[in-house]
Swiss-Prot record:
It comes from the Eukaryota. Pfam families: UPRTase (PF14681). Allosterically activated by GTP. Uracil binds at I200, G205, D206, F207. It is an enzyme of class 2 (transferase). This is Uracil phosphoribosyltransferase. Binds 1 Mg(2+) ion per subunit. The magnesium is bound as Mg-PRPP.
């Protein structure tokens, strides 16, 4: 199946498939789930950084020679969608030293069943930054759509957002990319479908509960 140009799926290989096999296995222990999820998250973060704009720069090496390199074109920050998105913060900090990370909390309104913003704490200059938006699962697309609305209201340009997640549904991909065609999406795998309960199939369950060892 083909997806829009703004959707990047990690190139499948035996190593990556093996990592997903472990975290999707219902028999996997929590410490192993965390360890192997972190490995996938690190790969996703690196791919997300590759999507950001760079500009050329010249530096001098210890040998006194010039080297033509590149650097980020603008400052970056992370924004995690609480709670599950917080599981991806360590992976981001592991490759981006001293990066600022904001948080957005969105929950479903029990009366309307629609996502509702409860809390947002973001860098004051976020409008001038490239934003890596973190949430491990993309099911219906409702939560991340609301999160992007918050970022746009704070002045972030749509094309300056990279949404990073581990597992997505085709339905969620379509909903999200139809609404935000200029937001880049980086995902580990796109699954088969959503079931009648809007769970990703085959999926892996509630990522936040599995990672943090809690239950709803």
């Amino acid at each position: 199946m083909s997806y829009p140009e703004n959707v990047v799926v990690l190139k499948s290989n035996h190593q990556l498939k093996g990592l997903f096999t472990i975290i999707r296995n219902r028999e996997t222990k929590r410490e192993d789930f965390i360890f192997y999820s972190d490995r996938i998250i690190r790969l996703l973060i690196e791919e997300g950084l590759y999507c950001l704009p760079f500009h050329e720069t010249t530096i001098t090496t210890p040998t006194g020679c010039e080297y033509q390199g590149v650097t980020f074109a603008s400052k970056i920050c992370g924004v995690s969608i609480v709670r599950a998105g917080e599981s991806m913060e360590a992976g981001l900090r592991a490759v981006c030293k001293h990066i600022k990370i904001g948080k957005i909390l969105i929950q479903r309104d029990e009366e309307t069943a629609l996502p509702k913003l409860l809390y947002a704490k973001l860098p004051h200059d976020i409008a001038n930054r490239q934003v890596l938006l973190l949430d491990p699962m993309l099911a219906t697309g409702g939560t991340v759509t609301q999160a992007v609305e918050v970022l746009l209201e704070r002045g972030v340009k749509e094309e300056n957002i990279v949404f990073i997640n581990l597992v997505a549904s085709p339905e969620g991909i379509k909903v999200f990319t139809d609404k935000y065609p200029r937001v880049k999406v980086v995902t580990g795998e796109i699954d088969s479908h959503l079931n009648e309960k809007k769970y990703i199939i085959p999926g892996l369950g509630d990522f936040g509960n599995l990672y943090f060892g809690t239950e709803d």
